[in-house]
């Protein structure tokens, strides 16, 4: 029997008195030692149990550790659920929630025709080549966009025969990270995520994820923060999910990231994204 992302995610949620504890499996890694942003959103969505079109939000205050039971509080709010995730010192790591959305879908962004591969890693949940639970997605980029066509792996099936929502939240978060990195020339993290799940899609259908580089803009009051817009659609262009995700550039963080990525990626690719950190 295949171990799935959905089953592993749900197994990490446990009752603890009147509260919950969330333990994110190490295979849900994003940057080394840190949970992928899409995994926390998916945990909020799983706990909420809301059907239909919905928005899942998360504001990340600090990096989220893996393999550690974290206190998760939930409370009804505006027909949905408010969620807050705390570390062992009772510091807020992520706050957000899930709410039904009535607004009609917007159109999906068009993918590029060709492009150069974005870097991949060994262990990342979204792109890690050796992460057997992960998506193993390969995104591309050109002067206009970040995009990719992803064929779901059997680990991404939900129990009801649809694509697990964590695949969509992670793909959108991954695309937003690279849009921010390309715009800033720096590594960093996604810090404010709002993903709308417009509809479910049968497991096995390919997903097109895309984001326009021209729509990636620095905040006027703080140019470390970059606002991105990303979409996920089926091959016919019908929207499945969309996201408004903020990337924060952390000056100098790319130095360590590039060092690790050089084992699997050509210097010429890394140089185009992180020119100040790649020889």
What annotation goes with each model-predicted range?
Residues 18, 52-54, 68, 144, ...:
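A generic structural signal for short beta-strands and their flanking turns/coil linkers
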Residues 1-22, 78-80, 87-91, 97-158, ...:
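Non-catalytic linker/capping segments at the edges of enzyme domains
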Residues 34-53, 163-188:
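Active-site helix/loop of acyl-thioester processing domains in fatty-acid/polyketide metabolism
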Residues 27-34, 153-167:
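Short histidine-centered catalytic/ligand-binding loop motif
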Residues 93-96, 241-243:
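A structural microfeature
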Residues 233, 239-246, 254-256, 260, ...:
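Mixed-charge, glycine-accented linear interaction segment located at domain edges/termini
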Residues 100-102, 215, 247-249:
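A short acidic/small-residue loop/turn micro-motif
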Residues 54-92, 195-239:
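Hydrophobic beta-sheet segments that form the core/acyl-binding groove
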């Amino acid at each position: 029997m295949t171990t799935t992302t959905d089953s592993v995610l749900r197994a990490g949620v446990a009752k603890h008195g009147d509260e919950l504890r969330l333990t994110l499996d190490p295979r849900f890694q994003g940057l080394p030692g840190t949970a992928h942003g899409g995994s926390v959103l998916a945990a909020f969505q799983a706990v909420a149990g809301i059907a239909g079109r919905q928005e899942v939000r998360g504001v990340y205050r600090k990096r989220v550790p893996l393999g550690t039971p974290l206190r998760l509080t939930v409370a009804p709010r505006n027909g949905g659920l408010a969620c807050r995730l705390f570390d062992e010192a009772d510091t807020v790591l992520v706050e957000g929630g899930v709410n039904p959305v009535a607004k009609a879908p917007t159109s999906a962004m068009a993918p590029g025709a060709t492009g150069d591969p974005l870097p991949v890693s060994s262990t990342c949940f979204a792109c890690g080549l050796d992460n057997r639970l992960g998506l193993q997605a390969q995104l591309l980029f050109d002067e206009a966009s970040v995009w990719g066509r992803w064929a779901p792996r059997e680990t991404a099936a939900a129990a009801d025969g649809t694509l697990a929502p964590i695949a969509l939240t992670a793909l959108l978060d991954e695309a937003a990270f690279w849009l921010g990195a390309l715009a800033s020339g720096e590594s960093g993290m996604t810090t404010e995520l709002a993903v709308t799940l417009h509809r479910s899609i049968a497991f096995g259908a390919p997903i097109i994820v895309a984001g326009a580089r021209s729509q990636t803009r620095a905040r006027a009051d703080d140019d470390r923060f970059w606002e991105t817009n990303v979409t996920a659609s089926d091959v016919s262009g019908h929207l499945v999910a969309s996201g408004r995700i903020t990337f924060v550039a952390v000056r100098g963080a790319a130095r360590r990231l590039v060092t690790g990525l050089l084992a699997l990626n050509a210097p010429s690719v890394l140089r185009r994204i992180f020119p100040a950190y790649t020889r």
